[in-house]
Amino acid sequence: MPRTQNKDNFIDKTFTVMADLIVKMMPINDKAKRAYVYYRDGLSAQNAGDYAEALENYEESLKLEESPFDRSETLKNMAIIYMSNGDEDLALDTYQRALDQNSNQPSCLKNMGLIYEKRGRTAQEAGLQDEADRLFDRAADVWTQAVRLYPGGYLDIENWLKTTGRSNIDVYF
């Protein structure tokens, strides 16, 4: 049974029925509608914590979806799952693929920076200061891009950039 038909409460069932009706009435081709249904089912599975099912639905959506914007959203959600599962290399690659489809994704850049910053702290704790500095600089690079796209939206990141001396932009109003 598709996840969208497996709802336990009235509100979820009502929302699903309404979403299905809207999709049917949308003036888009059948392929795009099917891509959206897979995306929606993937999002539902992801929200329920069923990451394997979510990834399957997202992969099917990507096979059908032609819109770069929609593909980027799907890829971003896949990267979030990879990151949650601890597969940081695959998450970084998938975030980059999302950015290649739509460069206006500050949350992808923010999450990439989180991975680089975490790796930098790990290297620092292991006494590998040169490696740590390289990773912190990489985090600063992607975080600077994120802050430029979403000024004021990542105050903790802006603060990190300032306190570590890695801020090379004036985004603080």
Swiss-Prot record:
InterPro entries: PSI_Ycf3_assembly (IPR022818), TPR-like_helical_dom_sf (IPR011990), TPR_rpt (IPR019734)
One matching Pfam family: TPR_12
An annotated GO cellular component: plasma membrane-derived thylakoid membrane
Keywords, in A-Z order: Membrane, Photosynthesis, Repeat, Thylakoid, TPR repeat
Main location class: membrane
Membrane topology: Peripheral membrane protein
Localisation per UniProt entry: Cellular thylakoid membrane
Family under the similarity heading: Belongs to the Ycf3 family.
Job description of the protein: Essential for the assembly of the photosystem I (PSI) complex. May act as a chaperone-like factor to guide the assembly of the PSI subunits.
Record-given protein name: Photosystem I assembly protein Ycf3
Organism: Prochlorococcus marinus (strain MIT 9313)
